[in-house]
Amino acid sequence: MKIQSTIRSQARIALLACLFAAGCHAPGPVAPPADGVVLWIGEQRKAVHDGDVSAKVRLAELARRPHLYGIGPLEGLTGEITVVDGRATISTVQGSTFRTHASLDHGAAFFVWTHAADWKSVPLPNSVRTLEQLEAYLPEAARSAGLDDSAPMAFRVEGEVQSLAYHVLSPPEHTPPTFADHEKSKIRSSLAAQTVRMVGFHSTEHRGIFTPGASDVHVHFVTADERFAGHVEGFTLAPGATLLLGVPKR
């Protein structure tokens, strides 16, 4: 019964993601998506510009299926969500203090995710050390791994950063928040010489949907000790970092 319930749940979420993202319709039952396929629900631009910040999906529902990786803002734009292999790290700001805790008992205003057990390691050239350089390199990395570089892609970066700039959303001033509220609620910080795990998603076709309006990537991070997490704004990688690409099952 639990397996059947999980399958029904994943099918329902797949249908919701389809309806939100592609405007499609489903005349019959929807099968759970294959491992490694990137899905999303809600839209960044609607949350940020239109104040549509209600929960579009619950993390616990997505995590019923193993190997969940995903990122997005908390409902209400009150914090950040980073899920690494089913473990959700929630980052918030209380006063001037950054806080993190592990919990699946949250909803996301918009969310992009994959369920992936298979990841392909791709060497990072010495010339790829910053977020901008990684964004430019990802299509080439996908091709070298035999993946479709035109499809939305999940990726991870693991290793040490020499520096990393990030923000965490704090509760906005108004409900629903305005765009000005959203920008003001970004509490920025940075760290150095830390071992991190980053989860990101790349697409050339989804700016303002699950990537920011001026970028083809959306990336979050968690430090190895889980004390810090948030939305990545920039970084400089130390030598030896690893790039992993999610491999969709065919």
Predicted segments with their positions:
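C-terminal motif of bacterial Sec signal peptides marking the signal peptidase cleavage site
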Residues: A21-G23
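Bacterial N-terminal signal peptides that target proteins for export
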Residues: K2-A14
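Bacterial Sec signal peptide processing site at the extreme N-terminus
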Residues: H25-V37
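Mid-length scaffold segments of soluble, non-membrane domains
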Residues: S127-L131, E140-I187
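Short, hydrophobic/π-rich interface segment
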Residues: P172-T223
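Conserved mixed alpha/beta catalytic, RNA-binding, or beta-rich assembly cores of soluble enzyme
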Residues: Q94-A142, E160, T175
